[in-house]
């Protein structure tokens, strides 16, 4: 670290400790809140409300208050950012004596500038602290301990996790959660040894167990076969894989300045939010023909992950999780491991969020950035009559985050290509949610439907869905965009055309609500509207729940893969600002019923990647990664192939590989 930088940090810290009238905000309006800012928010609010669980005032969410978009774009477009930066503020959701408060803190004035009490349905996302506190509460609860002993189990080997309650028609549901016990005793794979048949409900505002019942139902699955640690597994082992390393003799091709990344012809900003996790903003691509960067994506991030299970029994019907809105996809983001989660050429960045009492918590290596080359071809061509060929390797830049919400791990990738494409992918791995049964073979099953698959002795992997919804504020060459669809239709060849062909297909443009975002005010030299096309990838299934089923009412945003809404900085979370125990009255599906203009205006695309997961034995004890995603691909955005003038990669030495003869 340079002496100048070190001195700046020391002075900066000293200013904060003394009293931060000279508080200096981060250089970029989209930079995530820093540890200093989070501490400042805590101190400012603490002057009005005593903080801490004993005072019943807790921070449920602290994030950057969305700055005015016009001010951000004005700041970005100024050559040296010499216009005034948008006001920097924090948005806080807190619980205070059974009420939900929304507070806005302004850093310039170091004061609360807005405050109101939420009076609608739903509750804010759970904190890690209150989940841990309720687990300890249950473990000390005498009726629970007695039940564990009556089952012949050791209380010290029991762990307790949290499930949200969902909503099933209650007029004004309380802030309750369900707690679920699991048994270790020979396994670290917690979720594969559920202690089924217990109903444990905890009131979060009162911090007490309000309902307990033990029905002593199913047997406990055996610990055998649940191990996944290589150090504990026994031979024979699988094939040895050679380490595949991308060697960059001249170093990485990207440059990170603060939270801004510049690579090839791309420039974009990376941030972190406790609910969304990784956030990509202000993605622009350089166009050589006009010698400037052109806008593509103003902001993109995870909005929600809806995971409903398909077992209607008492122990399972409520398992209809909203991972981002109830638990926080950023709150449960994990530290990435170099060389395994990310390749050896990756750079890493940390993330920070506020704990329940407002103090900062750092997640080291919460995101990684790396150049990816898997042997794919960017473009190539061979002319038979002309010696030689032209080919370019397909190198891309990936920004990655992994969030582990309960038993599932989600690998979230944003992949930028020199062609102008942005590929957004999500990988599902981790551990199944399982149900203990008396069966060990399908021949023993008596019921019509066991709601899953026998994956091990006395163990059913329960059928479920994953719906991963993204919010994508696309600004294709500006903010005045429209959404259209190009439909393929069959047309008979006119007899007047001298050809032996009888048919062909062409495009017929319809104004609709899927597949293509264009800017009607920007056209190519040949008159085509500049745009970006949405290409569906693997996993684009829709919901199969009845639309009047309570979970689907709350998750009606999954009814379609694609939604288009006009830009509104309050419409960020597809499940609503308050997802826990919500009633579906403030979701993307509700906003879309307002019938607002989506032509030649600032619009937002919402896309849902959908998986129907019928578990199989290969998913046990850990699940091989299953990928889905989609691509945003330039369509008449450029005058020609932007990769055409990409220079070939020069190799200083030619690598040689020979097959092993073992």
From Swiss-Prot:
GO molecular function, one term: quinone binding
SUPFAM superfamilies on file: Amine oxidase catalytic domain, Amine oxidase N-terminal region
Modified residues annotated as 2',4',5'-topaquinone in this record: 408
Record field: catalytic activity: a primary methyl amine + O2 + H2O = an aldehyde + H2O2 + NH4(+)
InterPro entries in the record: Cu_Am_Ox_Cu-bd, Cu_Am_ox_TPQ-bd, Cu_amine_oxidase, Cu_amine_oxidase_C, Cu_amine_oxidase_C_sf, Cu_amine_oxidase_N-reg, Cu_amine_oxidase_N2, Cu_amine_oxidase_N3
Glycosylation sites: 154, 568
Positions with a binding annotation for Cu cation: 464, 466, 613
Cofactor list: Cu cation; Mn(2+); L-topaquinone
Active site (UniProt): 323, 408
Cleavable signal peptide: 1-22
Keyword NAD: no
GO biological process, any: amine metabolic process
Pfam families xref list: Cu_amine_oxid, Cu_amine_oxidN2, Cu_amine_oxidN3
Details of cofactor binding: Binds 1 copper ion per subunit. Binds 1 Mn(2+) ion per subunit.
Family: Belongs to the copper/topaquinone oxidase family.
Protein name per its UniProtKB record: Primary amine oxidase 2
Organism encoding this protein: Arabidopsis thaliana (Mouse-ear cress)
């Amino acid at each position: 670290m340079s002496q100048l930088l070190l001195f700046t940090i020391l002075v900066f810290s000293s200013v904060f400790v003394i009293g931060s009238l000279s508080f200096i905000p981060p250089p970029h309006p989209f930079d995530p809140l820093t540890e200093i800012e989070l501490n400042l928010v805590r101190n400012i609010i603490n002057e009005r409300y005593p903080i801490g669980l004993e005072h019943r005032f807790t921070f449920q969410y602290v994030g950057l208050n969305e700055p005015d978009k016009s001010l951000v774009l004005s700041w970005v477009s100024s050559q040296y950012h010499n216009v005034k930066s948008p006001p920097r503020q924090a948005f806080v959701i807190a619980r205070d004596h059974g009420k939900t408060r929304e507070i806005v803190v302004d850093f310039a004035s170091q004061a609360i500038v807005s405050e109101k009490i939420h009076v609608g349905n739903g509750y804010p996302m759970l904190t890690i602290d209150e989940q841990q506190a309720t687990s300890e509460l249950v473990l000390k609860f005498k009726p629970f301990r007695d039940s564990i002993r009556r089952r012949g189990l050791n209380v010290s080997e029991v762990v307790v996790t949290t499930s949200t309650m969902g909503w099933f028609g209650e007029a004004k549901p309380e802030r309750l959660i369900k707690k679920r016990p699991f048994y270790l005793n020979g396994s670290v794979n917690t979720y594969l040894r559920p202690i089924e048949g217990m109903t444990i409900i905890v009131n979060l505002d009162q911090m007490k167990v309000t309902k307990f019942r033990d029905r002593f139902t199913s047997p406990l699955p055996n610990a055998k076969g649940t191990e996944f640690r290589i150090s504990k597994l026994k031979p024979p082992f699988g094939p040895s894989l050679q380490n595949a390393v991308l060697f960059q003799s001249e170093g990485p091709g990207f440059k990170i300045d603060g939270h801004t990344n510049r690579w090839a012809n791309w420039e974009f900003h990376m941030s972190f939010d406790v609910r969304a996790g990784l956030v990509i903003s202000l993605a622009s691509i350089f166009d050589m023909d006009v010698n400037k960067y052109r806008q593509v994506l103003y902001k993109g991030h995870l909005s929600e992950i809806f995971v409903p299970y398909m077992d209607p029994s008492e122990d399972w019907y409520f398992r209809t999780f909203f991972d981002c809105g109830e638990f926080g996809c950023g709150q449960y983001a994990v530290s990435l491991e170099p060389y395994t989660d990310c390749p050896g050429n990756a750079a890493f960045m940390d993330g920070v969020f506020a704990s329940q009492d407002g103090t900062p918590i750092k997640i080291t290596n919460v995101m990684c950035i790396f150049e990816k080359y898997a042997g794919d071809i960017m473009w190539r061509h061979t002319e038979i009559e002309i010696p030689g060929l032209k080919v370019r390797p397909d190198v891309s830049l990936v920004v990655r985050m992994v969030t582990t919400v309960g038993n599932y791990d989600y690998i979230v990738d944003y992949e930028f290509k020199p062609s102008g494409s942005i590929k957004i992918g999500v990988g599902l791995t981790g551990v199944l949610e399982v149900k203990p049964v008396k069966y060990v073979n399908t021949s023993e099953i008596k019921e019509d439907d066991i709601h899953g698959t026998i994956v091990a002795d006395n163990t059913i992997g329960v059928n479920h869905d994953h719906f991963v919804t993204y919010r994508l504020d696309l600004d294709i060459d500006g903010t005045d965009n429209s959404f259209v669809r190009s439909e393929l239709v069959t047309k008979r060849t006119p007899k007047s055309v001298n050809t032996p062909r009888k048919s062909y297909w062409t495009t017929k443009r319809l104004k609709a609500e899927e597949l293509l975002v264009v800017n009607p005010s920007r056209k190519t030299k040949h008159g085509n509207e500049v745009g970006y096309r949405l290409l569906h990838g693997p996993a684009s299934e829709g919901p199969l729940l009845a639309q009047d089923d309570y979970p689907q009412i709350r998750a009606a945003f999954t009814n379609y893969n694609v939604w288009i809404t006009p830009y509104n900085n309050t419409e960020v979370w597809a499940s609503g600002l308050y997802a826990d125990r919500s009633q579906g009255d403030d979701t993307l599906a509700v906003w879309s019923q307002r019938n607002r203009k989506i032509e030649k205006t600032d619009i937002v695309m919402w896309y849902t990647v959908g998986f129907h997961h019928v578990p199989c034995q290969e998913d046990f004890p850990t699940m091989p990664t299953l990928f889905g995603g989609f691509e945003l691909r330039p369509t008449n955005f450029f005058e020609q192939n932007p990769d055409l003038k990409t220079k070939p990669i020069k190799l200083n030495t030619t690598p040689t590989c020979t097959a092993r003869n073992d």
